[in-house]
Amino acid sequence: FYFPNLNDNQAVTGLSGWNFKNVSASDGTWNACYTEIRRANILLKHIDDVDMPAASKNYYKSLAYLYRGWQHFCLVRKFGDCYWVDKELTTEDATILYGKRQNRNEVMDKVLEDLNYAVANMGEKNASSRTAYNVHVANAIKSRICLFEGTYAKYHLKDNAQKYWEKAPSHY
């Protein structure tokens, strides 16, 4: 075959094809989540400059808040304390870039604020679509996050559990 080293027809026995510089210390979650958070923050910063109907702006703003909340939740779920980023970062933002991580409770409270905004403002646009985000998807995501965080708080933090369980939409 063309590249026998790439299939199981020829086993590589030496380390010549191994480059230690290419091995990641993590699976890339940290970078990927903050990349999506950055995109959401850029959208939120510049969407008012775009000429489009108010309903569409509201929808895309809600979508950005939903994504930002979800990505912060993914970081908290995997790493615990993390940085809350709610603006487009520059090199001048040293306190965020090199500062201490924020407590998971603080971050999750802000995640809940983002999710509440998304649920309140997403509307029924695309409600009949099976491929587009709508208020029902936002509620389902909010439910999943609140139930996870409530359960985590009950068994690990011994606080805040009731708050998240009460905020979870009960019909999802």
Segments predicted by a language model, with ranges:
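Conserved, well-structured interaction surfaces
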Residues: F3-F79, T95-D109, E113-R130
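Amphipathic alpha-helical protein-interaction segments enriched in hydrophobic
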Residues: T131-I141
